Amino acid sequence: MAAPAARADGSDAALAAALADVPDLGRLLEVDPYLKPYAPDFQRRYNRFSQTLDNIGKNEGGIDKFSRGYESFGVHRCADGGLYCKEWAPGAEGVFLTGDFNDWNPFSYPYKKLDYGKWDLYIPPKPNKSLLVPHGSKLKVVIRSKSGEILYRISPWAKYVVRESGNVNYDWIHWDPEQPYKFKHSRPKKPRSLRIYESHVGISSHEGKIASYKHFTCNVLPRIKGLGYNCIQMMAIMEHAYYASFGYQITSFFAASSRYGTPEELKELVDTAHSMGITVLLDVVHSHASKNSEDGLNMFDGTDSCYFHSGPRGTHDLWDSRLFIYSSWEVLRFLLSNIRWWLEEYGFDGFRFDGVTSMLYHHHGIGASFSGDYHEYFGLQVDEDALTYLMLANHLVHTLYPDSITIAEDVSGMPALCSPISQGGGGFDYRLAMAIPDKWIQLVKEFKDEDWNMGNIVYTLTNRRHLEKCIAYAESHDQALVGDKSLAFWLMDAEMYTNMSVLTPFTPVIDRGIQLHKMIRLITHALGGEGYLNFMGNEFGHPEWLDFPRKGNNESYHYARRQFHLTDDDLLRYKFLNNFDRDMNKLEERCGWLSAPQAFVSEKHEGNKVIAFERAALLFIFNFHPSKSYTNYRVGTTLPGKFKIVLDSDAAEYGGHQRLDHNTDFFSEPYEHNERPSSLLVYIPSRVALILQNVDPPN
């Protein structure tokens, strides 16, 4: 990142004041002295967070109580069989409950107006003590607006909504089963190394339909476990009316999407994953919300300012969605309670926060090209209300469950976003290394293999802030969306339809694609971060792209599925890529390179197209040259002794050409090479990745 020029307010007095206010700010500035001119910014951010937390304590009894909004808001069965209902609708003139239970009479059950825009209602049980509103009943909140308009709404706190065939809008279903799912398994401990399988339940079947929670539990979870992933990131779980939005236009924030099944079936999915030792993260969308009003948050009380900024500030120009007003007390309650709901009710172990860049800046990242100059991350362009909310959310998550994980999707690279709150940071555990997939797509689209720049690859993979952990990935769901395509399809394209059979010889295109696909994944895994992510299906080189059913494709599910049968077919070459992914993950589990300090890169040779580095006492060697193999190639190492091959992309089980003898012993000698005290001689075939392990170090 570019070093910033000193600011006028970076005086010694301002620095001293900031250090006095922010407990561990000195540690952050020790790691990155270039942040010293911005110490007052960290001071202000930390003080805003602390003051908000104090205000919550004084007015609400603490964040623990404040984040339990779902226990009172919405509709709840009381111990006596009655019903307690509560809503926040500051712009309403009247609020009512209607539904099956009263034959949809809109006004027979009025709420009582409370302070601060809140309304509540108690409905006693029937004389025989039976439930007036049984499980499965349809409900609506009726709002009388200030203009006199009568509006039918779904409660923002609704736990379950469904859309019946033929209906445009969702129906709110009172979810109160007699026998709710009981969790059987404890949460796994926080993984030392995070290997994430990014998943979407709906597309997890090879059939042209929306798959179910049950299908995912029975068919996909065992695959994930077998591949060596220890974490699932679940997309599109929060209810969204438009399936093709990929889950990013949320309409009901407390409802698990009913298109895949029931809330209890999602709980079973999470519990089953826990039984396998798999951590489960939710892709949480608190950066914006759907514009839908009849089955969404928008215009809930008849005004455009209930949960969102009013006027133009409340609309995202690119996403055509509503933007939360994070300074609002009740919006904070709603969002923090939403975070807690998913942790407590469904057993999720943390979150990947979507759209963090949009939250952090008033410009939402629109038209902003972040150069790395520190001025871009401070000052008036930063939405400090949103940043305060994110700090509160991270504080809540890590206070409730210290082993929980939070990941920020931020393309801007904001410094200290993944530093502890006590340092003035955002409190996230990880950020996504979003430049890495862009680099791979750029290389395969725009450059010949012989023109790939080794130094640029290494720079992209290692360009991350010290002590702020990154999740590296070669491709996620973003890279496969319609208009783009999977990495395997960029490499092999239409030949994947005709030349993936093991009964036919390798074509040059398929050979190149399979070898590079393995190398790209391994170097990303080993060099790119402190965690690794793979989108479902890409472990075996899923062909084509993702396109959800919509009018533009005649509502087709053809590209909204994952063709797992391809890797299960022993006569197809997809199995080779799948085998490599499995063994790469299982070797990382044994050796722990993701949790080791950043690698020392000893070689990035442009002419030879060779990259070599050490991490976790392993020696990684990559030869990206399309045709040149090297005999007795000298590679530097810190470790003396005997080395063996522990992973070889050229092995037969990975679709390689078997040019290496795995019985070979490699001995390093005290011959300095590339700033390493020892070195060894290795045969490196073309387009091959090797990992050597020191198996017999001298005393």
From Swiss-Prot:
Q: Which Gene3D superfamilies match?
A: Glycosidases, Golgi alpha-mannosidase II, Immunoglobulins
Tell me which UniProt keywords the record has, alphabetically. Answer: Glycogen biosynthesis, Glycogen storage disease, Glycosyltransferase, Phosphoprotein, Transferase
- Disease annotated for this entry: Defects in GBE1 are the cause of glycogen storage disease IV (GSD-IV). GSD-IV is recessive fatal fetal and neonatal disease in American Quarter horses.
> Which residues of this UniProt protein bind substrate?
N59, E60, W88, A89, P90, D115, Y116, G117, K118, E330, V331, L332, R333
Instruction: Note the site residues: Transition state stabilizer.
Output: D478
Could you tell me what this protein is called? Answer: 1,4-alpha-glucan-branching enzyme
Q: Is Transferase one of the keywords UniProt gives this record?
A: yes
Q: Which family does it belong to?
A: Belongs to the glycosyl hydrolase 13 family. GlgB subfamily.
Task: Identify the domain of life.
Answer: Eukaryota
GO MF, any single term: hydrolase activity, hydrolyzing O-glycosyl compounds
**Which transformation does this protein catalyse, written as a reaction?**
Transfers a segment of a (1->4)-alpha-D-glucan chain to a primary hydroxy group in a similar glucan chain
